[in-house]
UniProtKB/Swiss-Prot annotation:
It holds the Pfam family UTP25_NTPase-like. Residues 84-124 have a biased composition (Acidic residues). Phosphorylated. Phosphorylation is required to promote p53/TP53 degradation in the nucleolus which promotes cell cycle progression and liver development. The gene is Utp25. Residues 127-136 have a biased composition (Low complexity). It comes from Mus musculus. InterPro entries: P-loop_NTPase, UTP25, UTP25_C, UTP25_NTPase-like. Expressed in all tissues tested: brain, small intestine, large intestine, stomach, liver, spleen, thymus, lung, kidney and testes (at protein level). Belongs to the UTP25 family. Component of the ribosomal small subunit processome for the biogenesis of ribosomes, functions in pre-ribosomal RNA (pre-rRNA) processing. Essential for embryonic development in part through the regulation of p53 pathway. Controls the expansion growth of digestive organs and liver. Also involved in the sympathetic neuronal development. Mediates, with CAPN3, the proteasome-independent degradation of p53/TP53. This is U3 small nucleolar RNA-associated protein 25 homolog. GO terms for molecular function: U3 snoRNA binding. Residues 1-201, 589-651 are annotated as: Promotes p53/TP53 degradation. Residues 652-713 are annotated as: Represses p53/TP53 degradation. The keyword GTP-binding does not apply.
Length: 772
């Protein structure tokens, strides 16, 4: 009997029925082998499979996923039920034929024993069949859920692997297990989670901002009219410029003290903020104040939902103060927005809506992500998430739920042993390049009451934290097949931190991001249009988006982004303090600084004018062998390539170092320049930013353009004393500038001297530093 059963199994493995072939063709998987043995007993289990799946996931899946996953099972069950009777008839005929053959070949007692064995094994096989069917269905459901949970994840291919690990899979990790737990559509507001936004809606700045209704005439007038501006001086921030295109500009003075109860903070922020911010309140700070003077003024502007540009955020001085206060504003905004949605869910559940009442529940955008935080490195993203956890948790004994926390710490944290112990760099370098400095990342964060979900799919996230490069690879470019930027359509709060570092990375990524902010999405992404705010449907989201821009310096490119892309209807506030002394005062060596002004007709012709001025006026003075050991500092990589090609064409004795130069090439170039074997050394600003090497052997210094960071000017000038051999009297420094370099010039020499140099009829100005 056992031999015949094995023979039957081998025949079933080698042959396939029409229905099995049809099943393979329809569903892409092979029909289970043992269905023929235990089909009659397995029928109830297979038919109940979709019901058990629905019942187990009905409360834990989002609506879109529930429909697609259960639809597959219902279709599978329907197909099985339709063909069930035909398959049973065929199997009964085959079993009758086999039984007749068995009666002729074997005795009755052997046949009885064989039948008993058959029944026992059939039961066990039936159990295995049920388990196989359930496991296959579960895998299919998981795959379906994974493909449908985030449309943009198929495009997030690059750079989400842990540091030092090669990318093995083409898709990034996203948390698809906690979809229902953090779904805004299926959750309701807890009784004790109400906040100030529900208690005082008329006074809450959040409610005033999102409920403000713009008119078509105002939009048209703002597009053509110049902004109205007013200036004011604050105690800490200094000189402020208030501007607005939509209304008469309103300025306000910061009060001396801040009452947390009047700031309309959502629970539990009123109680957790003081402890989270306590590290900055030591010393002369008043014990009853929860903000530093700087944080107090910054938060008042943030909480008024005006755009803000603060160009004095430095990693060494006040970077963490600023990070704490904008994280408070971001988490406060998200908690208020989600609380409004959950409260409306409860209202909709408790009452039947009548005609014309849908507008009362318009509380969302076209997509869920409402806050985008752009930071340069993974270490910054790690600190932002840690602040979110601290603000939600505080000193409460009850810990909040943070999903995927261990994975996040592994991918965004760093090992202190990886840093060379003998590496000596300036303090500002140590403050910027701390921790994990990978600049290609993006992560979604979902927040619901007292729970945080890390690695949430973008379209299920409240907050997106990413680098410009991480966003650029998912936004894509014109003509690319795999690109997505719908998740940017309803961003209500955009925070760009450490904007000056993006000038050293790739500023084009920032411009590309700003050009794709608040565009109408190409897909609905399962949105309930009856819950979408009217100004979002009208494609006016950009007039309601608040942008917070933080950097370490005043730069024309950063100013351009703030002036062009920040058009919030509430107005804009920019900090415009001018440097009085300049970084030239930090030059310690005795050195004559010759500033030569070049003329340019317009901004577009500055690049060519500088190049021709350099090769015709400056370079001939240094061609003599006496003027050896000349370092040429070039801020722009494109100018560097142009000069390098020209030097090669003219067969000049030079070497070069840029951010792409290999370590061996850097060592050779530094050695040749120190020994005088190469007369010129071309050095890019980005190399100096990322490495901060001290170049030895400099006797003559040329700044092809003023540095982006003003303190780089004094750093490079002080390199001359690295190899002082009595040639101090022959040292020279030449700087090229134009009238379009006013901001950089003021940062180097001071605003008063810069004004005189730009207005003077003379084109050459001399400064001498280090005089005794």
């Amino acid at each position: 009997m056992g031999k015949r059963r094995n023979r039957g199994r081998s025949q079933m493995l080698s042959t396939m029925t029409k229905k099995q072939k049809k099943h393979l063709r329809d569903f892409g998987e092979e029909h289970p082998f043992y269905d023929r043995v235990s089909k009659k007993e397995a029928k109830p289990q297979i038919c109940q499979l979709p019901e058990s799946s629905d019942s187990s996931h009905s409360e834990s899946e989002s609506e879109s996923e529930q429909e697609h996953v259960s639809g597959y099972h219902r279709l599978l069950a329907t197909l099985k039920n339709v063909s069930e009777e035909e398959e049973e008839e065929e199997e009964e005929e085959e079993e009758e034929e086999e039984e007749e053959e068995e009666e002729e070949e074997e005795e009755e007692d052997d046949s009885a024993v064989g039948d008993a064995e058959m029944n026992e094994e059939a039961g066990s096989e039936d159990g295995s069949v049920g388990e196989a069917a359930v496991s296959e269905a579960a895998e299919e459901a998981a795959e379906t859920q994974e493909h449908m949970s985030l449309a943009d994840n198929s495009k997030e291919k690059d750079g989400e692997e842990p540091p030092g690990v090669s990318q093995k899979s083409s898709e990034e990790f996203t948390d698809v297990k906690h979809e229902s737990l953090f779904s805004l559509e299926t959750n309701f507001l807890e009784e004790d989670s109400g906040g100030s936004c529900s208690q005082r809606p008329s006074q809450d700045p959040f409610q005033q901002h999102v409920n403000k209704e713009l008119k078509e005439k105002e939009i048209q007038a703002a597009a053509s009219s110049p902004p109205a501006t007013q200036q004011l001086k604050w105690p800490v921030l200094g000189h402020l410029v208030f501007s607005s295109k939509f209304q008469k500009t309103e300025t306000f003075k910061p009060p001396k003290d801040i009452d947390l109860k009047l700031l309309h903070l959502q629970k539990p922020l009123e109680s957790t903020w003081a402890k989270t911010n306590s590290q900055f309140l030591s010393g002369p700070q008043k014990s009853n104040s929860s903000f530093t003077p700087l944080q107090k003024e910054l938060f008042l502007i943030m909480n008024s939902y005006r755009d803000l540009f603060y160009p004095e955020r430095t990693a060494l001085k006040n970077g963490e103060e600023v990070r704490h206060v904008y994280c408070l504003h971001a988490i406060n905004h998200v908690l208020k927005a989600n609380a409004q949605v959950l409260a409306n869910n409860s209202r909709r559940r408790s009452q039947k809506l009548g005609v014309g009442e849908d507008d009362d529940f318009r509380d969302q955008g076209l997509t869920r992500p409402k806050v985008l935080i752009v930071v340069p490195f993974r270490e910054a993203a790690l600190r932002v998430v840690q602040l979110f956890i601290s603000l939600l948790e505080g000193d409460s004994k009850k810990k909040i739920i943070v999903s995927n926390k261990k994975r996040f710490q592994g991918e965004y944290g760093s090992d202190p042993e990886e840093r060379p112990p003998n590496l000596k760099r300036p303090e500002d370098y140590e403050a910027v390049f701390v921790g994990n400095i990978d600049d290609h990342f993006r992560i979604g964060v979902a927040i619901l009451q007292r729970s945080i979900r890390l690695y949430a799919p973008f379209y299920s996230s409240d907050i997106l934290i990413a680098s410009p490069l991480g966003l650029r690879t998912i936004i894509g470019g014109e003509g690319e097949k795999k690109r997505d930027f719908d998740f940017l359509s309803s961003v209500e709060l955009l925070i760009i931190d450490q904007a000056d570092i993006y000038l050293m990375q790739n500023w084009e990524h920032v411009l590309h991001l700003m050009n794709h902010m608040n565009l109408l999405p190409l897909d609905s992404h399962g949105v309930d249009f009856s819950r979408v705010r009217m100004w979002s449907l009208n494609n006016w989201s950009k007039y309601y988006r608040q942008t917070l821009l933080f950097g370490a310096l005043q730069d024309a490119q950063i100013n351009s982004v703030f002036n062009k892309h920040c058009i919030n209807a509430q107005g804009q506030v920019a900090v415009r303090n001018v440097p009085m002394t300049g970084s030239i005062s930090h030059v310690l060596v005795q050195l004559p600084h010759v500033f030569q002004r070049m003329e340019a007709q317009d901004l577009s012709s500055v690049i060519d004018a500088r190049f021709h001025f350099f090769i015709n006026k400056i370079l001939p003075q240094y061609r003599d062998a006496v003027m050896s050991h000349t370092l040429i500092y070039v801020p722009s990589y494109f100018d560097f390539v142009r000069l390098r090609n020209y030097f090669k064409k003219e067969e000049l004795n030079f070497t070069h170092i840029c951010e792409y130069t290999q370590k061996s090439g850097i060592s050779r170039a530094r050695h040749f320049f120190l020994q005088g074997e190469k007369q010129f050394l071309l050095l890019t600003e980005r190399f100096h930013f990322y490495k901060r090497y001290t170049i030895k052997g400099i006797r003559n210094l040329i700044f092809y353009e003023l540095p982006t960071y003003p303190h780089f000017y004094s750093e490079v000038c002080n390199m001359l004393r690295a190899t002082s051999r009595g040639e101090e009297a022959t040292w020279t420094c030449t700087v090229l500038y134009s009238k379009y370099d006013a901001q950089r010039l003021a940062a180097v020499v001071g605003v008063e001297r810069a004004a005189q140099m730009l207005q003077s009829p003379k084109n050459v100005h001399l400064f001498v530093t280090g005089e005794k």
